[in-house]
Amino acid sequence: MIKQAIEKVVNHENLTFEESEAVLDEIMNGEASEVQTASLLTALTAKNPTIDEIAGAAASMRSHALAFPETKDVLEIVGTGGDHANTFNISTTSAIVVAATGTQVAKHGNRAASSKSGAADVLEALGLDINETPAVSYESLQENNLAFLFAQEYHKSMKYVATVRKQLGFRTIFNILGPLANPAHPTHQLLGVYDETLLEPLANVLKKLGVTNAMVVHGRDGLDEMTTADETAVVELQDDHLTKYTVTPEQFGLKRRQRADLVGGTPEANADITRRILAGDHGPQRDIVLLNAGAALHVAHPALSIQAGIDLAAKTIDDGKAFEELNRLLAFSDKRKDVVA
């Protein structure tokens, strides 16, 4: 299959969903050579992958992932990375705030690739066990409304492309597959992307993958998040319909900030920023978390406007519930470590 797929893509022909899924199956099963894998990835990058090609590849990744117990109405807050902004862990902090409102969040993430601190790095620095089994993570989702699914534990088949990706050295389809391959199969998703041209295609991919409500966002300062330093371009998926619009921080009563105010550092430094935000510190870092948490709450509960989501996120922090959520997660993690020990 991969030989035919390479020939097709080299000739600027598109693969169907089924063809893309089948060829990724070959790669994920270790049946393709590194030369073949590199050829396909290079040809896809040169052509630009279509919605069907991305969705088929994501479906393959999901099917090869470690199984996660079935969930219902679960939210994911994630970015593609690759914006080279070195911000603190905005999505992860926002996920904790959203979980504290009683909304279930299955956060799928990894260690840092293009930044200094990925979701796994900062959660580990906060004191959480990032290597929990699917059963334990599911238990955390039910008890604490938040589960972390460590990508490298769930996607063992990625070992077949790791060397090729590193040696190619440029972005490939795999740079956008990670946020689409959550084994918890979220039905609601806030997805940040590094390039505005990805907004509509990835919204359509999410639709094909069974997501019912989503916002795909790109900060015009370059962030793969909702940003407080510039406008944010949005494509929203709701009721099978896509809507494009732009938002500014000012329309939600938030100050426009400098991107330098949002820069993080090491996992330990970012963990400290997260703790301070959850404990109620005010300032630029809180504001961007409120904006992203508010958008995520709107995605999870469409009847709630983004503004109402921001207000709920602020109240959740100010009432101490967000910090309580972090402490619950830490206590749960410690308890499970003791059981294993």
From Swiss-Prot:
Membrane-crossing residues?
none
Q: List ligand-binding residues for anthranilate 1.
A: 79, 110
Q: Which UniProt keywords apply?
A: Amino-acid biosynthesis, Aromatic amino acid biosynthesis, Glycosyltransferase, Magnesium, Metal-binding, Transferase, Tryptophan biosynthesis
Q: Any one cellular component term from GO for this entry? A: cytosol
Q: Give the catalysed reaction(s), semicolon-separated.
A: N-(5-phospho-beta-D-ribosyl)anthranilate + diphosphate = 5-phospho-alpha-D-ribose 1-diphosphate + anthranilate
* Record text on subunit structure and interactions: Homodimer.
Q: What does this protein do?
A: Catalyzes the transfer of the phosphoribosyl group of 5-phosphorylribose-1-pyrophosphate (PRPP) to anthranilate to yield N-(5'-phosphoribosyl)-anthranilate (PRA).
Q: How is this protein named in the record?
A: Anthranilate phosphoribosyltransferase
Q: Which organism is it from?
A: Lacticaseibacillus paracasei (strain ATCC 334 / BCRC 17002 / CCUG 31169 / CIP 107868 / KCTC 3260 / NRRL B-441)
Q: Lineage from the top down?
A: Bacteria, Bacillati, Bacillota, Bacilli, Lactobacillales
